[in-house]
């Protein structure tokens, strides 16, 4: 179908999300490659999500304020680079004025740190925290990066967050703790680590 109608690769839904961006969200790298081969020029949020640093640089150099913009579905371009694990892109956007704590405008409240934590990108989490990301940022139902890391079993990230000042005793709006999430999800190593740091 794409061979006959390559313009479909640039199609967008009612939220303004392109086929390429939705494919990136799904993690299907092979299909992303197929869509990009159709020659549709990448917009900044797509280039950031896909880690295309040269395209990101080209677009930001043409319009510097773009480094601080959002995708059509409300995510900071900077956060998309972080959630998909593209440290060089995140570093570049930050150097051009992207707000390290910028939150999504779509009701999720996600930012670069929450996305990198959820995706398990330890190096990016460390870099974000070293450059001013808030380790106690709250979003959704009172979630924090530590709660997400504990629930997902990311022990290294839990350690980095605590070393960066994350509140060990933080609770969601319905009273769940990092230790509670770790135990509930069977994350035994994380649970033991949290207990060794005073969680109860």
Could you describe each region identified by the protein language model?
Residues 2-5, 28, 37-40, 52, ...:
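Alpha-helix initiation and capping sites
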Residues 136-184:
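Ankyrin-repeat and related helical/solenoid repeat scaffolds used for protein-protein interactions
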Residues 30-31, 55, 88-89, 123-124, ...:
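Conserved ankyrin/ankyrin-like repeat signature
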Residues 22-28, 46-52, 80-86, 115-121, ...:
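Ankyrin repeat A-helix N-terminal signature
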Residues 17-32, 36, 169-200:
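Leucine-rich solenoid repeat scaffolds
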Residues 48-89, 98:
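Conserved small-residue-rich
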Residues 2-7, 34-40, 60-65, 91-99, ...:
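Ankyrin repeat domain, specifically the short helix-to-loop turn at the C-terminus of the second helix
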Residues 12-18, 41-46, 69-77, 103-112, ...:
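Ankyrin-repeat boundary/"N-cap" motif
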